[in-house]
Amino acid sequence: MAQTAQTKKKRKKKKRKKQSSRSGVLIAVLVAALILVVFVLFRFLRSHSAETTPEPEVSVSVAPTLPPSGLSAQCFGESDGYKTYISDTVTAKLGVDISSHQEWVDWEALAASPVGFVILRAGYRGYGDGSVNIDPYFAENLAAARNAGLGVGVYFFSQALTPDEAEEEARTVLSQLADYQIDYPIYYDWEPISDENARTATISATEITSCAQRFCQTIEQAGYRAGVYFNLDIALSYYHLTDLMDYEFWLAEYQDTPSYPFAFGMWQYTDQGTVPGVTGGVDMNLCFKSYGN
């Protein structure tokens, strides 16, 4: 009987050990599950907060070392449907830019209008194959504009990838000027193309700026004044303008008055202007500097 009682006690102890072991496992599982729930809840709340909390706005500004424009919004006006700018020191000239898109132009009618100058496209580089092309109307337009007594400037639409290509574009322009005198600058007009297959789709701001520099250097070494054309997006996102301050700036901004706060010599204010002698919409410009005649 004593052995039987002792055996029963041992069995009870074993049973208690098994129950204690099972309880420990259960508690561990519950603790692990609780930790997992807390972790998942934390991740959810963090993700939800990121989705519903707006990102802080990032302000973008052009380097303050650029000189101010010096233009006053109060001096802008309108006469006969054209923009004007008249201050104590500046009376802006009205001009248009012309390419083969306008095809035939009645230059005498244009010269008899308030338009005092034209900026002619000399050529362009293809954004796909990169071929350099002369504007088919350039030679005719240049001769006719000079004969009509209009001031003349030039631009080249670039899709250069390297400074060497930009120099090639500049020399193409120079080869087309022949013996003609021009009064206004020769502008480098690089613009982004909304096509994923465009050759310049991945070009950097540093590369674009270097191309503009080489183009302008080549033009000025030949004795002409050089400039760079840009809109606000190109100014803020593509060019390092402080590296181009030695050249003239031609701003495109289609507003009542330009908001760009830094110095520029010419303002393209619309691409839907109408002038005598030109069919359809045309780019209109105000020039604030005395470049030409």
Name every feature range the model reports, one short phrase each.
Residues M1-S61, T65, I219:
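Gram-positive cell-envelope targeting signals
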Residues V62-I98, Q102-W104, L244-N293:
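Functionally critical loop-and-helix segments that line ligand-binding/catalytic clefts
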Residues Y82, D88-R214, E220-A222:
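Substrate-binding cleft of extracellular glycoside hydrolase catalytic domains
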Residues G126-Y127, L161, A235, P258, ...:
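Flexible, glycine-rich phosphate/dinucleotide-binding loops
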Residues V152, R225-G227, F249:
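Hydrophobic anchor at the start of a short beta-strand
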Residues F156, F230, E253:
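Short beta-strand/turn micro-motifs composed of small residues
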Residues L174-Y188, P192-S194, H240-A263:
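Structural recognition of alpha->loop->beta junctions
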Residues I219-S237:
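Aromatic-lined carbohydrate-recognition surfaces of secreted/lumenal glycan-active proteins
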